[in-house]
Protein backbone atom coordinates (compact mmCIF):
# COMPACT_ATOMS: atom_id res chain seq x y z
CA UNK A 1 0.00 0.00 0.00
CA UNK A 2 1.12 3.55 -0.70
CA UNK A 3 0.50 5.74 2.32
CA UNK A 4 1.13 9.48 2.68
CA UNK A 5 3.10 10.61 5.73
CA UNK A 6 2.68 13.71 7.89
CA UNK A 7 5.64 14.14 10.24
CA UNK A 8 5.38 16.48 13.22
CA UNK A 9 8.83 15.38 14.39
CA UNK A 10 11.62 17.31 12.66
CA UNK A 11 14.30 14.61 12.98
CA UNK A 12 13.59 13.03 9.57
CA UNK A 13 13.70 16.26 7.55
CA UNK A 14 16.76 17.60 9.39
CA UNK A 15 18.80 14.38 9.53
CA UNK A 16 21.49 13.39 7.02
CA UNK A 17 20.79 15.00 3.65
CA UNK A 18 20.94 11.70 1.77
CA UNK A 19 18.23 10.23 4.00
CA UNK A 20 16.10 13.36 3.59
CA UNK A 21 16.50 13.25 -0.20
CA UNK A 22 15.66 9.53 -0.25
CA UNK A 23 12.42 10.16 1.66
CA UNK A 24 11.41 12.88 -0.80
CA UNK A 25 12.31 10.72 -3.79
CA UNK A 26 10.46 7.68 -2.42
CA UNK A 27 7.32 9.74 -1.85
CA UNK A 28 7.57 11.08 -5.41
CA UNK A 29 8.04 7.62 -6.91
CA UNK A 30 5.16 6.18 -4.88
CA UNK A 31 2.83 9.03 -5.75
CA UNK A 32 2.24 9.91 -2.09
CA UNK A 33 2.83 13.00 0.02
CA UNK A 34 5.56 13.50 2.62
CA UNK A 35 4.55 16.60 4.57
CA UNK A 36 6.15 18.29 7.60
CA UNK A 37 4.89 21.89 7.57
CA UNK A 38 4.69 22.07 11.38
CA UNK A 39 8.42 21.21 11.69
CA UNK A 40 9.13 24.94 11.43
CA UNK A 41 6.97 27.75 12.79
CA UNK A 42 4.16 25.57 14.16
CA UNK A 43 1.05 26.48 12.14
CA UNK A 44 2.68 29.18 10.02
CA UNK A 45 2.81 28.42 6.26
CA UNK A 46 6.58 28.77 5.96
CA UNK A 47 7.65 25.57 4.19
CA UNK A 48 4.69 25.66 1.81
CA UNK A 49 5.41 29.30 0.95
CA UNK A 50 9.04 28.50 0.13
CA UNK A 51 7.88 25.61 -2.05
CA UNK A 52 5.29 27.78 -3.81
CA UNK A 53 7.90 30.46 -4.52
CA UNK A 54 10.36 27.95 -5.97
CA UNK A 55 7.68 26.16 -7.99
CA UNK A 56 6.75 29.50 -9.54
CA UNK A 57 10.34 30.01 -10.68
CA UNK A 58 11.56 32.25 -7.85
CA UNK A 59 14.92 31.74 -6.13
CA UNK A 60 15.41 31.94 -2.35
CA UNK A 61 18.50 34.06 -1.73
CA UNK A 62 18.40 34.66 2.02
CA UNK A 63 16.40 33.59 5.06
CA UNK A 64 16.46 35.47 8.36
CA UNK A 65 14.25 34.13 11.11
CA UNK A 66 13.40 33.82 14.79
CA UNK A 67 12.35 30.18 15.04
CA UNK A 68 12.31 29.49 18.78
CA UNK A 69 9.25 30.77 20.60
CA UNK A 70 10.94 29.66 23.83
CA UNK A 71 14.07 31.74 23.33
CA UNK A 72 12.06 34.71 22.10
CA UNK A 73 9.92 34.51 25.26
CA UNK A 74 13.03 34.36 27.46
CA UNK A 75 14.72 37.36 25.85
CA UNK A 76 11.48 39.35 25.88
CA UNK A 77 11.04 38.61 29.60
CA UNK A 78 14.49 39.79 30.70
CA UNK A 79 14.31 43.19 32.39
CA UNK A 80 15.70 45.11 35.37
CA UNK A 81 13.21 43.18 37.53
CA UNK A 82 13.52 39.79 35.77
CA UNK A 83 17.09 38.45 35.49
CA UNK A 84 18.11 35.90 32.88
CA UNK A 85 17.86 32.94 35.28
CA UNK A 86 14.32 33.90 36.32
CA UNK A 87 13.26 34.30 32.68
CA UNK A 88 14.46 30.76 31.98
CA UNK A 89 12.56 29.45 35.03
CA UNK A 90 9.40 31.20 33.87
CA UNK A 91 9.73 29.67 30.41
CA UNK A 92 9.92 26.21 31.95
CA UNK A 93 7.10 26.81 34.46
CA UNK A 94 4.78 28.09 31.72
CA UNK A 95 5.52 25.14 29.45
CA UNK A 96 7.35 27.13 26.76
CA UNK A 97 10.64 25.28 27.24
CA UNK A 98 11.45 21.60 27.44
CA UNK A 99 11.52 20.13 30.99
CA UNK A 100 15.30 20.45 30.60
CA UNK A 101 15.61 24.00 29.19
CA UNK A 102 19.19 23.34 28.13
CA UNK A 103 17.71 21.69 25.03
CA UNK A 104 16.24 25.06 24.04
CA UNK A 105 19.23 27.10 25.20
CA UNK A 106 21.62 24.95 23.15
CA UNK A 107 20.03 26.19 19.93
CA UNK A 108 19.94 22.67 18.45
CA UNK A 109 16.22 22.92 17.75
CA UNK A 110 16.77 26.14 15.80
CA UNK A 111 19.64 24.50 13.90
CA UNK A 112 17.33 21.68 12.81
CA UNK A 113 14.64 24.14 11.70
CA UNK A 114 17.15 26.21 9.72
CA UNK A 115 18.50 23.09 8.01
CA UNK A 116 14.96 22.18 6.93
CA UNK A 117 14.28 25.65 5.53
CA UNK A 118 17.62 25.77 3.71
CA UNK A 119 16.93 22.40 2.12
CA UNK A 120 13.46 23.47 1.06
CA UNK A 121 15.10 26.56 -0.45
CA UNK A 122 17.20 24.27 -2.63
CA UNK A 123 20.51 24.08 -0.77
CA UNK A 124 22.41 20.99 0.37
CA UNK A 125 22.93 21.65 4.08
CA UNK A 126 23.82 19.40 7.01
CA UNK A 127 23.45 20.29 10.69
CA UNK A 128 27.25 20.29 11.00
CA UNK A 129 27.42 23.06 8.38
CA UNK A 130 25.53 25.51 10.60
CA UNK A 131 27.71 27.97 12.51
CA UNK A 132 26.17 27.71 15.99
CA UNK A 133 27.17 30.48 18.39
CA UNK A 134 26.27 29.68 22.01
CA UNK A 135 25.28 32.51 24.35
CA UNK A 136 26.01 30.61 27.58
CA UNK A 137 29.21 28.65 28.35
CA UNK A 138 29.53 25.07 27.16
CA UNK A 139 29.93 23.63 30.67
CA UNK A 140 26.33 24.65 31.48
CA UNK A 141 25.19 21.88 29.15
CA UNK A 142 27.16 19.27 31.07
CA UNK A 143 26.31 17.71 34.42
CA UNK A 144 22.86 17.29 35.94
CA UNK A 145 19.80 19.50 35.58
CA UNK A 146 19.99 20.41 39.29
CA UNK A 147 23.58 21.58 38.82
CA UNK A 148 22.46 23.68 35.85
CA UNK A 149 19.79 25.45 37.94
CA UNK A 150 22.33 26.11 40.70
CA UNK A 151 24.82 27.66 38.26
CA UNK A 152 22.35 29.65 36.16
CA UNK A 153 22.11 32.75 38.44
CA UNK A 154 25.87 33.21 38.00
CA UNK A 155 25.10 34.51 34.49
CA UNK A 156 22.63 37.17 35.65
CA UNK A 157 25.16 39.96 36.25
CA UNK A 158 26.71 39.58 32.80
CA UNK A 159 23.32 39.47 31.08
CA UNK A 160 22.12 42.53 33.00
CA UNK A 161 25.20 44.51 31.96
CA UNK A 162 24.59 43.58 28.33
CA UNK A 163 20.86 44.35 28.67
CA UNK A 164 21.62 47.84 29.96
CA UNK A 165 23.95 48.41 27.02
CA UNK A 166 21.23 47.28 24.60
CA UNK A 167 18.74 49.57 26.32
CA UNK A 168 21.06 52.55 25.85
CA UNK A 169 21.47 51.65 22.18
CA UNK A 170 17.72 51.14 21.67
CA UNK A 171 18.18 47.50 20.67
CA UNK A 172 16.69 44.13 21.63
CA UNK A 173 17.97 40.57 21.73
CA UNK A 174 16.81 38.06 19.15
CA UNK A 175 18.10 34.52 18.59
CA UNK A 176 18.40 34.64 14.81
CA UNK A 177 18.70 31.84 12.27
CA UNK A 178 20.26 33.02 9.02
CA UNK A 179 20.74 31.42 5.61
CA UNK A 180 22.69 33.50 3.11
CA UNK A 181 23.20 31.36 0.05
CA UNK A 182 25.07 28.27 1.22
CA UNK A 183 26.11 29.88 4.53
CA UNK A 184 23.99 29.13 7.59
CA UNK A 185 24.25 30.31 11.20
CA UNK A 186 22.33 30.68 14.45
CA UNK A 187 23.32 33.34 16.97
CA UNK A 188 22.03 35.75 19.59
CA UNK A 189 21.96 39.18 17.96
CA UNK A 190 21.09 42.73 18.95
CA UNK A 191 18.60 44.24 16.51
CA UNK A 192 17.67 47.91 16.19
CA UNK A 193 14.14 49.33 16.21
CA UNK A 194 14.17 49.64 12.41
CA UNK A 195 14.64 45.87 11.97
CA UNK A 196 11.51 43.72 11.36
CA UNK A 197 12.60 41.35 14.17
CA UNK A 198 12.61 44.14 16.78
CA UNK A 199 8.86 44.22 17.50
CA UNK A 200 8.45 40.43 17.79
CA UNK A 201 6.40 39.81 20.93
CA UNK A 202 6.01 36.94 23.38
CA UNK A 203 6.77 33.55 21.87
CA UNK A 204 6.03 34.55 18.27
CA UNK A 205 8.05 33.30 15.30
CA UNK A 206 9.01 35.36 12.26
CA UNK A 207 10.62 34.56 8.91
CA UNK A 208 11.97 37.01 6.33
CA UNK A 209 12.42 35.58 2.83
CA UNK A 210 14.65 37.47 0.43
CA UNK A 211 14.17 36.13 -3.08
CA UNK A 212 14.95 37.11 -6.65
CA UNK A 213 11.50 38.74 -6.74
CA UNK A 214 11.29 39.96 -3.13
CA UNK A 215 14.78 41.43 -3.07
CA UNK A 216 14.34 45.00 -1.87
CA UNK A 217 11.46 44.22 0.50
CA UNK A 218 11.63 40.64 1.86
CA UNK A 219 8.47 38.59 2.33
CA UNK A 220 7.50 38.44 6.00
CA UNK A 221 5.66 35.57 7.72
CA UNK A 222 4.90 36.07 11.42
CA UNK A 223 2.77 34.57 14.17
CA UNK A 224 2.43 31.58 16.47
Question: Where are the regions a protein language model picked out?
Answer:
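Rossmann-like dinucleotide-binding core of oxidoreductases
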Residues: 38-44, 50-54, 58-90, 100, ...
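Catalytic, metal-anchored helix/loop core of enzyme active sites in primary metabolism
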Residues: 62-64, 72-75, 90, 175-224
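Substrate-binding/catalytic subdomain of NAD(P)-dependent oxidoreductase enzymes
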Residues: 77-78, 86-198
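Rossmann-fold NAD(P)-binding glycine/threonine-rich loop
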Residues: 10-37, 42-53
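Short phosphate-binding/catalytic loops that engage adenosine nucleotides
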Residues: 3, 32, 171
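Rossmann-fold NAD(P) dinucleotide-binding segment
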Residues: 1-7
